[in-house]
Amino acid sequence: MADNTVTDVKKLSFERAIEELESIVKRLEDGKVPLEESVAIYERGEALKRRCEELLRQAEARVEKITTDASGRATGVAPLDVQ
């Protein structure tokens, strides 16, 4: 995969990367893509998947939960414990 392709992926929004990844999956599932092209778009799909995972990790790190006191009043925020 060319370096400029990886650079292009790194500039994509989550929504655009998912949209393109879904398109690649559909093309591969259809089975009408020549082998060489299949390998190339599979590699692009892998880069898109990594981009989406990276953006999700960043979003998760920014999500916080509101902490409250015994009476239920907000007292601040803490990292969200996602499990």
UniProtKB/Swiss-Prot annotation:
Pfam families for this protein: Exonuc_VII_S
Domain of life: Bacteria
Catalytic activity: Exonucleolytic cleavage in either 5'- to 3'- or 3'- to 5'-direction to yield nucleoside 5'-phosphates
GO MF annotation terms: exodeoxyribonuclease VII activity
Keywords linked to the UniProt accession: Cytoplasm, Exonuclease, Hydrolase, Nuclease
Family: Belongs to the XseB family.
Name of the molecule in the record: Exodeoxyribonuclease 7 small subunit
